Amino acid sequence: MVIILTIVGLILLTGFQALVNSLKKTYLIEIQYYRQFNQASSSLNWAKKQVWQPPSEQWQCLLDNQYQFKACIKKSRLKIDNYTLLRAQADDYYLYMLTYFADNHLIIEKGHWLDYCPEKRLVDCE
């Protein structure tokens, strides 16, 4: 009887340990996602205040070494309006924003923040 209780207890502890490991992995993945999202979001806000050269067909990037911000702009290929595509990067996570370009600054309109690239072809997002 003692052996059966020991085996059942061992099985329960093993199952509980597997559950804890799974939850810990999920937690670490979510922490990394939120860190990257917040870093990319901060990069977007930083990029709005920078002085840019006129956008071209190629990505033009600015870096901030102190805070590890990276943001890039290029002309959007969307047929509507004359958008400039702003891309902020944190590791391998990207956020996008459709903006207008005037006087070497980006003009932002509310509602143009995106967590996906709005271009039709994937190659235009790389």
What residue ranges belong to the model's regions?
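Conserved functional hotspots that engage anionic ligands or polymers and/or phospholipid headgroups
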Residues: 26-27, 34-38, 45-126
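Aliphatic-rich helix starts adjacent to a transmembrane/signal segment
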Residues: 3-38
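Charged/polar interaction segments and conserved charged motifs
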Residues: 1-3, 7, 53-57
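Short hydrophobic alpha-helical module
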Residues: 15-19, 43-50
